[in-house]
Amino acid sequence: MKVYVCFPEGKAKALTMSYDDGKIQDERLVSIFNRYGIRGTFNLNYGMIDKEGLIPPRIKSSRINELYAGHEIATHTMTHPTIARCPMTEVAEEILADRKGLEQITGRIIRGHAYPNGSYNEEIKQLFRQLGIAYARVVEPAADFTLPTDPLEWHPTCHHDAPDLMEKAEFFAEFKKK
């Protein structure tokens, strides 16, 4: 038996974008995504929402549901620590509080994550499995379009400022299912 990986509506490829921290610049970014039918995952820190004095400012809780409608919300910890340096109890508290707060605001079940500062290890991945986190994005790019073998170590293809971004975009646009 053959198993074929496909995306919604049987599509052979998917473009996803992932941005962290819920910065005020998301207002403009989401409007561009919406204009072109691009969907993204926005990894938010519940502990920074509505906090005054942050530079750049963050999206207010009152704007989250409207702004990110049609996009995914994922965890990014409460306070953005470098979690591989933290005791596991603190990591669990950071994730659970972030998830609970985001679920309270959005009314959605939150299952994704992006590691703050790209910080993770095997012990953290095991903890995330126990906490119900289904996937987590790392910082280091994979430089290809393959799906991850470990969803808790999901490497992006590239970053938006990658020198070879346009080459990758052209390859992706020309890709045809065989």
Predicted regions and their residues:
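Metal-dependent polysaccharide deacetylase catalytic core of the NodB/CE4 family, i.e.
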Residues: 34-124, 141-154, 158, 178
